[in-house]
Amino acid sequence: MTLNKKTNNENSSKTTPKLSKETDLRNDFASKNYVFNPQDKVFQIAQVFGITSAVLIKKLLQLGLKADVNQTLEKDIVELLAKDYNIQVSEPQEKHTPPQLQPQTPSLTKTKPNQKLNLQKKSPIVTIMGHVDHGKTTLLDAIRKTRVVDQEFGGITQHIGAYQVEYQGNKITFIDTPGHEAFDKMRARGAKITDICILVVAVDDCVKPQTLEALKHAQKAQIPIIVALNKIDKPNNNTQQIMQELSSYDLLPEEWGGTTPYIAISALKREGLEKILEIILLVSEIQNLQANPDQKAQGTVIEASLDKSLGLVATFIVSDGNLKVGDIVVAGASYGKIRSMEDENKKKLTKALPSQPVRVAGLKEVPQAGDIFYAVANEKQARQIVAEKKSQTKENLAKTLSPLNLEDILQDLETEKPQELNIILKADTQGSLEALQGMIAKIKVSDLKVQLLRAAVGTITETDIAFAKSSDSLLIGFNIKPASSTLKSAQRQEVKITIHNVIYRIIEDIEQKLKSMIKPTFEEVVTGKVEVRKIFNISKVGNIAGCYVTQGIVNNSDFAKVMRNDEVLFKGKIASLKHLKDNIKSAKQGYECGILLDGFNDFEINDIIETSKLSKVEE
């Protein structure tokens, strides 16, 4: 599009430069095409979309991006926004003059256009993906020459970890995304921040659904994929089958004329690792990865948790700029001043450069894994940004979060409704919490419901116990250790606390609890038949039918149905079962017995009595 270049007050959000006639015609005729111009600012793009600048800024905030009316946007961000208005974004036919950004305007581009001279080569960020147990963490540990796998519970990496290694003088940052489908959100977020994806497939197995999920995440983000064919030391080798199947998903091997590198490795025996690292460096060289280490930092939150000594800590990966101790940062819906910073080896740092993973302390609230973080000018600006974000998401959060008002919950519990299992969930990190919430939401046992009343990061507190007691809830903790005083308090108040380090155990516990809540269903099962051959009248007792058991077994606890000429005369309980004068528990086929019924005396010879019992139907 052609924009009016005569805009004298671009610094003022109140003055909106007028678009050219060509742009006006695009709006008048609801044009579906917009030629991307890196000079276009937020207010200009908003006019093309036919919306106000405020609406566009709100949409950016919902994406976790802070902008003002005079800010430029990256093409991929514009394309994402344009989809909502059915507008196609195309490349310009000729190069545009680099725009002059206003001073102190935070940019959403990876590098500010007026700082291109400061661009420097940056290390690649590599995500290791694949199916559970195919060897992702083993590969990462082999590269780091450490052992972490044995410390993990259940054979699954519980959280995303980020680490930096050095090979031939070049640094490479690795992200290990958990392989189980429960961590789908975390894996998807991991794919968004990475430069290269290593897709691990075990050759003694096959391509799994999780393999394809990981593949699709990477392809959707247009990330180069390197396939690591792991466990080549195993006797069963399905390499050709795996290559053929992955080829159908546009991962044609180089040796077959494609562009996807397939590397045979044994992570356990550390075979093929150098080849993997060489290919990573080669791919990153082709990508020409660059960043500006002089500007304010921005990047992605990898994980967040509570530390006993530091309080709330978060793992950041810096994608651009320079993050320093003392910086004010916004991370999702949280903000704070960086008090301390350390690398994966707990070495204290004063700054972090592009592609570097660091653990920081100083945020006021727990951010979510995958949130964008960026440094801002001061705390006042950070507060304003976060306040606006929270205002925008308040309605959505209200729909997704369970009620926390105790009076409302108690009133809800008193009303008639389908049986529910109330749960209060506490976890060590935000990533674990999200994974558990997702899996709990999928639990289905009969028509019973799981009501997640509260879900939060941190250990179990006295408040949680009081809340669980009042709402009759099951209190579940994942990978946390409550204080002994808290456990004693729960015991005194008869509040059950379940603590696990393996997610599946929690899910199994919930399912078992739900099954125990199911109201049993019974069916009538015929136990025996008898023929009335004599009638005995006992004073003060009534008539006793002298019977011969023709079929099955008659029990003294059975129900009885008296039939005459195929007509049912009575249904009721056996009051007494006798043999001669003795009370007996049962009488088998071919034996005689006396039956006294509760509420029926009008027996006749040749009546048939059918006995039955109620049997619980297994779900």
UniProtKB/Swiss-Prot annotation:
By its UniProt entry, which Gene3D superfamilies does this protein fall under? P-loop containing nucleotide triphosphate hydrolases, Translation factors, Translation initiation factor IF- 2, domain 3
Region feature G2, mapped onto this chain? 155-159
Q: Which InterPro entries match?
A: EF-G-like_DII (IPR053905), IF2_II (IPR044145), IF2_N (IPR006847), P-loop_NTPase (IPR027417), Small_GTP-bd (IPR005225), T_Tr_GTP-bd_dom (IPR000795), TF_IF2_bacterial-like (IPR000178), TIF_IF2 (IPR015760)
CDD domains on file: IF2_eIF5B, IF2_mtIF2_II, mtIF2_IVc
| GO cellular component terms given for this protein | cytosol
Q: Which portions of the sequence form the region G5?
A: 266-268
Asked if the Swiss-Prot or TrEMBL record annotates the protein with the keyword Nucleotide-binding, the reply is yes
- The UniProt annotation places GTP binding at 130-137, 176-180, 230-233
**Molecular function terms in GO for this entry?**
GTP binding; GTPase activity; translation initiation factor activity
Region described as G3: 176-179
Biased composition regions of type Low complexity, renumbered to the chain: 1-18, 98-111
tr-type G domain: residues covered: 121-289
Q: Where is this region: G4?
A: 230-233
Task: Name the segments for region: G1.
Answer: 130-137
Q: Which HAMAP family match?
A: IF_2_B
Briefly state the protein's biological role: One of the essential components for the initiation of protein synthesis. Protects formylmethionyl-tRNA from spontaneous hydrolysis and promotes its binding to the 30S ribosomal subunits. Also involved in the hydrolysis of GTP during the formation of the 70S ribosomal complex.
Can you name this protein?
Answer: Translation initiation factor IF-2
Lineage summary? Bacteria, Bacillati, Mycoplasmatota, Mollicutes, Acholeplasmatales
